[in-house]
Amino acid sequence: MEERKTIYLCLAHMSESNMEQKYVKEAFDTNWVVPMGPNVNAFEQNLADFANNNSDGSKLNRKVVCLSAGTAAVHLALIACGVQPSDEVCVQSFTFCASSHPITYLGAKPVFIDSERETWNMDPELLEKAILDRKEKTGKYPKVIIPVALYGMPYDCGKIMAIANTYKIPP
């Protein structure tokens, strides 16, 4: 019998500076919990500044928006990728429902990809098999791939990006 190996889940923690508590208190003290407020506005601007610096020194014109939930972010990303009711979207099977609900909100079909033993995240080999299976059965590739970094464990970004690039599917 194979020996089981424990996978430790990453628990939420504060940074060493504990600045998170300061900003949460400031948001409540100034009543800027909803809508967004100056901290979120500053974060959006700082992230846009960072995202718009091209490696060659030129400036890009990328837009940044903070959303209230990951579900909203996935939903917006799927819309931006042009997902339509007839499309299929690859998503890992072991995740929170927020990863697949936006797919069904748009009338598309989730294609669930099983996980690796080591990380519990999307298995790149099974992803590629599913992509080829969907192409054979439907005549087209899935429209998008939604990998998830579960419990603080990163998915194999290099392998998943290579597969996405091979089949020209946005991750």
Regions found by a protein language model. Give the residues of each.
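Conserved PLP-binding active-site segment in aminotransferase class I/II-type PLP enzymes
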Residues: 1-80, 84, 106, 128, ...
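Flexible loop residues that form catalytic
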Residues: 69, 94, 150
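Proline-centered loop/turn at the N-terminus of a beta-strand
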Residues: 63, 88, 109, 143-144, ...
